[in-house]
A protein has these predicted regions:
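Internal, glycine-rich beta/alpha segment that forms the wall or movable "lid"
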Residues: 55-63
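C-terminal interaction segments
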Residues: 10, 14, 21, 145-212
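Charged/polar, low-hydrophobicity segments characteristic of intrinsically disordered regions
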Residues: 18-33, 110-125, 186-204
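Short, helix-capping/interhelical loops that line the mouth of catalytic, cofactor-
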Residues: 1-52, 56, 100
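Short, contiguous alpha-helical
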Residues: 1-15, 62-117, 157
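Glycine/small-residue-rich hydrophobic helix-like segments
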Residues: 118-161
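Amphipathic alpha-helix face/heptad-repeat signature
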Residues: 35-42, 71-75, 103, 146
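Short helix-capping/linker segments at secondary-structure and domain boundaries
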Residues: 88-94, 119, 162-170
Length: 212
């Protein structure tokens, strides 16, 4: 089934369609509530399948194959990141939870990818990352004596590496040239290099704007 979908999507992409447009044929004109119900039902099935999967099992995807564990983390990241767009559009402040640690870890793990994907030389040393979790715990990656560091809220770090916020719209403290460069190009997802949103362009719309 996946091989068929992959073949169709690849063919549409070769014809110049966007990834979004390439999905229309197999969605069979589903939209609105019907599309949501299809997505929700399939997400439950996917959750059950992942719960019983061997974490090391290799899974095919539109990009390179990945382990089930990596695929689970990637799906969580994508759902969280695109979900932020919904919170922003509806003017709802999101409540963060410590499950966001998986996304922060993926952000750190893709440090090298953020540079390689743009044809840039990967720095020898990864910055020290010290984040405050939603529950108040301290999460750390890297060596605390590193000349470069990133410190701040875990939720804001996740927003930057998933490119739902410009780093200048957060209170993350980036020290050192490597850390500052990384936060300008951070990309924890696969695909061609994507630029983060422009400063001030992504935010949660104030509720009063809805006139209700």
């Amino acid at each position: 089934e996946f091989a068929k979908i992959y073949s169709n999507v690849s063919s549409h992409l070769d014809q110049g369609m966007s990834l979004l447009e390439s999905q229309y044929p197999f969605l069979n004109e589903l939209s609105g509530k019907n599309l949501f119900e299809r997505w929700y039902g399939n997400s439950r099935k996917l959750g059950v399948a992942f719960a019983h999967a061997d974490p090391s099992m290799r899974l095919k995807w539109f990009g390179p194959e990945m382990s089930a564990k990596s695929s689970i983390t990637a799906r969580q990241m994508e759902t969280w990141a695109h979900g932020q767009e919904i919170f922003d559009a509806l003017g709802v402040k999101r409540t963060a939870h410590d499950r966001i640690k998986n996304i922060c870890h993926l952000g750190v793990a893709t440090f090298g990818w953020s540079f390689t994907n743009r044809g840039l030389k990967v720095p020898h040393h990864i910055p020290y990352v010290r984040l405050i979790s939603p529950s108040g715990q301290i999460w750390e990656w890297g060596d605390s004596v590193s000349p470069s560091s990133i410190k701040g809220k875990a939720s804001e770090f996740a927003e930057v590496v998933t490119q739902v916020r410009n780093v200048q719209d957060t209170r993350l403290a980036s020290e050192g040239a490597i850390a500052k460069k990384w936060m300008k190009i951070a990309q924890c997802f696969a695909g061609k290099p994507e630029n983060p949103p422009a400063k001030g362009s992504r935010f949660t719309v104030p509720r009063e704007n809805f006139g209700v």
